[in-house]
Amino acid sequence: MAIEMLGLILAGGQGTRLGKLTKDVAKPAVPFGGRYRIIDFALSNCANSNVKNVGVITQYQPLTLNAHIGNGAPWGLNGINSGVTILQPYSSQEGSKWFEGTSHAVYQNISYIDQQNPEYVLILSGDHIYKMDYEAMLESHKEREASLTVSVMEVPLEEASRFGIMNTDDNDRIIEFEEKPKEPKSNLASMGIYIFNWKRLREVLVNGYSKGNPMEDFGGDVIPAYIEAGENVFAYRFKGYWKDVGTIDSLHQSSMEFLDLNNELNITDKSWRIYSHNDISAPQFITEKSNVKNALVGDGCYVDGTVLHSILSQNVHVQEGTVIEDSFIMSGTFIGENVTIKNAIIGENAKIGDNVEIIGENEVAVIGHGEIKGENKNEQ
């Protein structure tokens, strides 16, 4: 049975710039916002945009990510006419098939895509924080009779070299594209979100690999090839909140922005919910002696200290005399007495002993998942 549009989320990235936080966890599975993982935003956008069939392409350290996604039930992707499929590298008679790039990952999963039989494929990155209506982007794609539509946004010119940068004509047709240029000519950046006509993309990928001209990356190979061939390639301008949380600084900054009641993500918006898989925990307990201001405190937390402008994920234990400020504490972490944590990210299931100081002065301080720092006498 044919479907109109298949979603493909590229979720195999290692995220080396996140250091300790991705040592054993794929970047899209890194926690965010107290109750989410980064990939929840792409999955929830699919659910809210009526994209009912989604393939998640994984590679690096996929166990936590796979367990989190499960059968897709939190996002409504477990119905009769909907579903989520985890797509991992595999071996065949031709040998191993590790993904060499973004478009190579799609090429290696052609059989799955053909099985879904879509008219269009929506390519997404699994490591960005944003809300977006993909149906509106698809309507723009169809109205312009595009072969490829690239979602774009304006970024500060000094940051443009981190992105694929393009120039457009007056009708937003893309006439020039350069992946991460050293000297960018514009500040119109690719968001790593694409809609392709599947038959044409399939033809381009198969021809490239069969003729010894492999198309391994969308930004470096496929998009420039489309433009050079005179294909109808258009930009779709996005003006909402979008953050690439690929560095410690950007993850911390986005987490702190999450605490702003006026932030553009508006996580309380019932018309565009962000869904996630969460364990059932007891209610949070805030003691009489505690001081909690401008903070998100997850279920199962016990707080007997001071928490200021910070996020505590589920089941975080904060003992008496401890001060946490401008920090993101991930789930399951135990923090002892008289601890000072400022400008920091603490990984899941970490243990922080009594009288420890973790202060990010010139850069964000990071404690990895399961890391132990100091000793505490009252650990529960």
From Swiss-Prot:
What does the record note on quaternary structure?
A: Homotetramer.
Q: Which NCBIfam families match?
A: glgC (TIGR02091), PRK05293.1 (NF003670)
Instruction: From the UniProt record, report the name of the gene that encodes this protein.
Output: glgC
Give one GO molecular function term. ATP binding
Q: Name the residues that bind alpha-D-glucose 1-phosphate.
A: 164, 179-180, 190
Give the protein's biological function. Answer: Involved in the biosynthesis of ADP-glucose, a building block required for the elongation reactions to produce glycogen. Catalyzes the reaction between ATP and alpha-D-glucose 1-phosphate (G1P) to produce pyrophosphate and ADP-Glc.
According to its UniProt record, what is one Pfam family this protein matches? Hexapep_GlmU
Stated EC number for the protein is 2.7.7.27
Annotated source species:
Lactococcus lactis subsp. lactis (strain IL1403) (Streptococcus lactis)
Q: Which family does it belong to?
A: Belongs to the bacterial/plant glucose-1-phosphate adenylyltransferase family.
- Uppermost EC category: transferase
Q: What is this protein called?
A: Glucose-1-phosphate adenylyltransferase
Q: Give the GO biological process terms.
A: glycogen biosynthetic process
Give the UniProt keywords, A-Z: ATP-binding, Carbohydrate metabolism, Glycogen biosynthesis, Glycogen metabolism, Nucleotide-binding, Nucleotidyltransferase, Transferase
Q: Which pathway does UniProt place it in?
A: Glycan biosynthesis; glycogen biosynthesis
SUPFAM superfamilies linked: Nucleotide-diphospho-sugar transferases, Trimeric LpxA-like enzymes
Catalytic activity of the protein: alpha-D-glucose 1-phosphate + ATP + H(+) = ADP-alpha-D-glucose + diphosphate
